From Swiss-Prot:
InterPro entries: NCS2, UacT-like, Xan_ur_permease
Location(s) in or outside the cell: Cell membrane
PROSITE patterns: XANTH_URACIL_PERMASE
Lineage: Bacteria, Bacillati, Bacillota, Bacilli, Bacillales
Induction info: Expression is very low in excess nitrogen (glutamate plus ammonia) and is induced by TnrA during limiting-nitrogen conditions (glutamate). Expression is further induced when allantoin or uric acid are added during limiting-nitrogen conditions.
Function: Uptake of uric acid.
Family, as annotated: Belongs to the nucleobase:cation symporter-2 (NCS2) (TC 2.A.40) family.
Record-linked PANTHER family: PURINE PERMEASE C1399.01C-RELATED, URIC ACID TRANSPORTER UACT
Protein name from the UniProt record: Uric acid permease PucK
Organism whose genome encodes this protein: Bacillus subtilis (strain 168)
Length: 430
């Protein structure tokens, strides 16, 4: 992870990572803010503080020290898992209870990070490879929805949107085919730029939000008032944090494999503690719980640029645009179909890397084949048929609402079962 790049290259690589996660980062505050009835000024704050905290959380995770920080090229963003619970808590107990629950959940994760770190033994290659595949597969519907124009769009599925999205995909693939070196490493960024330029001539780019946005926005402690603590809300948000840790674990193992690093219990403990700190800070500044973003795994694999310096630039950019709303608004001009076209390549690379991780597994073992088949099938099923567990409520609803969690728990449970019942049935080549 010691590649050398000049300042301009680092900036472009960091910008590429930021643009890849930006849509997901601002979508959560938009949904939550609208659902809990925030006014325009409050919503502006929520988006700005979220971007600021995404950057701060990323930098915390990069800072590998004695107590926290996994030191992998990982980008953190607000977790989609929190959307439903935050809206529910806000409507039941009020907005301050949302942030009391986030603060409590973050503090518990920080204190229990040592316990969570011991779970590393439950993640052999057959489990981690399956989990990474599930993460990638579960993101494909998001990519296709965006390519079509985004859910709720009046032009959803229009020929213009589809051609624009697939055109971006084709452009990125052509860059990979005809170029090597640095051009190939920023193919996603160039695809986004080219797609936005094409969309401009199609009348799909609107700069009005850039003109209307303010120049400076300062983070504020307890912006929505002093937090309140309700036990049901705290328990719910703790479950959200645990789901986020499970999702992050797959990302950590994928990045460790890409960067040829073996993760220890201590590494995971520090990674989880950094994530807990990010969640805690999110609560204090009235933002969100945070988790590792899997789309950035695809970019690391595509670009072959594994330096944490690149991700540090991403973190700094996010902090900066969180302080300067006008800069943040500039990134929103990228049309949704353009993002969708790039996502197809990024998320596809996450899937392919999961397959690569499974190449170290003994696929002659029926136990391993059953672990992969069952975990991927259940994870994909829960993702594509979200109504499957609609009758559940409370904690069960939070856990079952994530295909990644369903698939991960299935892989872990089956691996433990086969190891216990038939010690040689799920052997893994090391």
């Amino acid at each position: 992870m010691k590649e050398q790049h000049n300042a301009l290259q680092l900036m472009m690589l960091g910008l590429q990572h930021m643009l890849a996660m930006y849509a997901g980062a601002i979508l959560v505050p938009l949904i939550v803010g609208a659902a809990i009835g925030l006014n325009a000024g409050q919503l502006t704050y929520l988006i700005a503080i979220d971007l600021f905290m995404c950057g701060a959380a990323t930098l915390l995770q990069l800072w590998r020290n004695r107590y926290f920080g996994i030191g992998l090229p990982v980008v953190l963003g607000c977790t989609f898992t929190a959307v439903g619970p935050m809206i529910s808590i806000g409507s039941t107990y009020g907005v301050p209870a949302i942030y009391g629950a986030i603060i409590a959940a973050g503090l518990i994760v920080v204190l229990a990070a040592g316990f969570f770190g011991k779970l590393v033994r439950f993640f052999p290659p057959v489990v981690t490879g399956s989990v990474v595949m599930i993460i990638g597969i579960s993101l494909i519907p998001t990519a296709m929805n965006n390519l079509a124009g985004g859910e709720g769009s009046k032009e959803f599925g229009s020929l213009d949107n589809v051609l624009l999205g697939f055109g971006v995909t084709a452009f990125i693939l052509l860059l990979f085919y005809f170029f090597k070196g640095f051009i190939r490493s920023i193919a996603i960024l160039l695809g986004l730029i080219a797609g936005t330029a094409a969309a401009y001539f199609m009348g799909k780019v609107d700069f009005s939000e850039v003109l209307e946005a303010s120049w400076l926005h300062v983070p504020s402690l307890f912006y929505f008032g002093p937090p309140t603590f309700e036990l049901p809300a705290v328990v719910t948000m703790l479950l959200v944090a645990i789901v986020s840790l499970v999702e992050s674990t797959g990302v950590y193992f994928a990045l460790a494999d890409i960067t040829n690093r073996r993760l220890s219990e201590k590494d995971l403990e520090k990674g989880y503690r950094a994530e807990g700190l990010a969640i805690l800070l999110g609560g204090l500044f009235n933002a969100f719980p945070y988790t590792a973003f899997s789309q950035n795994v695809g970019i690391v694999q595509l670009s072959k640029m594994k330096s944490v310096n690149v991700i540090a630039i991403t973190g700094i950019i996010l902090v900066a645009i969180g302080l300067v709303p006008k800069a943040a608004a500039l990134t929103t001009v990228i049309p949704t179909p353009v993002l969708g076209g790039a996502m197809i390549v990024m998320f596809g690379m996450v899937i392919s890397y999961g397959i690569k991780m499974l190449s170290s597994v003994d696929l002659d073992s029926q136990g391993n084949l059953l672990i992969i088949a069952s975990s991927v099938s259940l994870g994909l099923g829960a993702t594509t048929v979200p109504a499957l567990f609609s009758s559940l409520s409370g904690a069960a609803s939070v856990l079952a609402g994530s295909g990644i969690v369903i698939g991960s728990l299935t892989a872990i449970a089956l691996h433990a079962f086969f190891q216990t019942k038939q010690p040689n049935s799920a052997d893994i080549k090391t």
